[in-house]
Amino acid sequence: RLSLVGSEMCIRDSSKASLSEIQRLWSGLGYYSRARNLFECSMVINSRFNNNFPESEKELLKLPGIGTYTAAAISAIAFNNRSVVIDGNIKRVISRLFFLKKPIKSNYNEIWRFTNLVTPDIRVGDFVQALMDLGSQICKPSKPLCESCPLILKCDARKLSLIHI
């Protein structure tokens, strides 16, 4: 019997389960499309990747329900591959750090380019998680805690007193 609580469910286990069993286990967690994607991913990983979770963004994008952000995040955080990860927090940090003038919502390519410039080749997962934490805890959407920011001396928006971005 499968359980999501108190044990580790491996790809092999989930690929042997039925969709209804995965959905039953998922009950109460919300986002029910994720249960279906988990089931479908396990099938693809079992058949196409011999039960080995793919590590590269390119391979991860072949999995159902995995988009650009999720593929980059898994590749960087789980496998420490150099991937450019961009979530809402990272967009805000990068936009302020380099004082990118276009609105965040319409500036993905420029944000990607600058994020790529600062993404290291080593300890990528640590870097990505640190940027996410920085954006959620210090470089907040409103009332950022600039005085607590480790990047205060490098931040172009702060230098220009334009932290409203």
What does each model-found stretch correspond to?
Residues 1-11, 163-164:
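Single conserved hydrophobic/aromatic residue that forms the stacking wall/gate
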Residues 10, 25, 74-77:
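Short coil/turn segments at secondary-structure junctions
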Residues 56, 66-162:
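Contiguous mid-protein beta-loop-alpha structural module that forms a pocket-lining wall or clamp
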Residues 6, 16-19, 87:
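ATP/adenylate-binding site constellation spanning eukaryotic-like Ser/Thr protein kinases
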Residues 8, 12, 20, 36, ...:
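Generic alpha-helical secondary structure signal
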